[in-house]
């Protein structure tokens, strides 16, 4: 790496979009953005929308949004560790929107160029519900774009919204 060149997997910002299949009639569409500034602090914002095709026709949907204030507390040339605290919201077509809190822990590893492996875990509450999400993904950085695949275990109390997903991330 030459002086001044950005190592893309650990660039100061990124945005991603992904599509996941929960089951034969439920899909997940998600987007995330992360930006980090001075002193390793950052913001991590995400939207997860689940859409279910109903047996009688039509669709039902729910949406989760989260915003974390993060700190990259450890790093080397090929690995980063982040943690954060934040806010989470839940919206559906039935009742009022609900909000709560969440905790995030994430690791990004670049074992060999161009591959990146990521793990993240977050847990929190919205109303009386406990929401947890665990993700594993692997991608390959090509210039400033990273196509990736992964698996996500998403829980809302006892409800499982697990999915396998495909996505793309853009570094800036």
Predicted regions and their residues:
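Short glycine/proline- and aromatic-enriched beta-strand/turn motifs that initiate or cap beta-hairpins
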Residues: 1-51
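Membrane-embedded beta-strand positions in outer-membrane beta-barrel channels/transporters
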Residues: 28-34, 66-68, 102-106, 135, ...
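Outer-membrane beta-barrel proteins
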Residues: 2-5, 30, 37-39, 70-75, ...
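Repeated loop/turn-to-beta-strand initiation elements of outer-membrane beta-barrel proteins
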Residues: 39-45, 76-81, 109, 113-119, ...
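Long, low-complexity, intrinsically disordered polar/charged segments
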Residues: 100, 111-124, 169-172
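Outer-membrane beta-barrel translocator/channel fold
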Residues: 47-67, 81-96, 123-172
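Histidine/lysine/aspartate-rich catalytic loop segments that bind and position anionic ligands
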Residues: 78-116
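Short solvent-exposed loop/turn micro-motifs enriched in small/polar/acidic residues
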Residues: 24-27, 100, 131
């Amino acid at each position: 790496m030459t002086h001044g060149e950005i190592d893309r997997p650990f660039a100061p910002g990124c945005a991603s979009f992904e599509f996941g299949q929960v089951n034969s009639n439920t899909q997940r569409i998600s987007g995330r953005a992360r930006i980090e500034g001075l002193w390793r602090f950052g913001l991590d914002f995400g939207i997860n929308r689940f859409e279910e095709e109903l047996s009688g026709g039509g669709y039902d949907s729910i949406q989760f949004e989260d915003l974390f204030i993060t700190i990259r507390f450890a790093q080397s040339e090929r690995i980063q560790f982040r943690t954060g605290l934040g806010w989470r919201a839940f919206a559906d077509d039935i009742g009022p929107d609900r909000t709560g809190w969440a905790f995030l822990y994430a690791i990004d590893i670049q074992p060999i160029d161009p591959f990146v492996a990521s793990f993240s875990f977050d847990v929190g509450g919205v109303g009386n519900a406990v929401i947890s999400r665990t993700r594993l993904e692997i991608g390959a950085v090509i210039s400033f774009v990273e196509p990736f695949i992964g698996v996500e275990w998403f829980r809302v109390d006892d409800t499982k919204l697990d999915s396998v997903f495909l996505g793309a991330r853009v570094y800036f």
